[in-house]
Amino acid sequence: MQTQCTVLQLLVLVALCSCGGILKEKYFQKGVDYLTSHIPIPVVKDVVKSAAKQLVHKISKNQQLCLIVDTVQWCNKSCLAAENKEGYCHGTKCKCGIKVSY
């Protein structure tokens, strides 16, 4: 039960991290360290800690909610406003005027 509660708290941290701008990534990484220290099984603790840190890092690098596809059109709108070019999601990055080649 304690492990499930800790994993749930980690998911809440990841959700907050995806909001961006409110807090820096390092604060979420410290939260991951604190929460995973409460998992009693060492192997599970290490796996969950590693996965959560990678997830927090990837989500915090996200631009305009890009996740391979621009589902909410924020990338396109920001590029049209800034450079008057179409915006395309390249993984988690938004690039203006550069089409995806894959």
Swiss-Prot record:
Expression sites (tissue/organ): Expressed by the venom gland.
Main location as per UniProt: secreted
Boundaries of every BetaSPN-type CS-alpha/beta domain copy: 63-102
Keyword terms: Disulfide bond, Secreted, Signal, Toxin
Entry annotated with the keyword Signal: yes
Localization per record: Secreted
Function: Inhibits voltage-gated potassium channels.
Protein name per its UniProtKB record: Scorpine-like-2
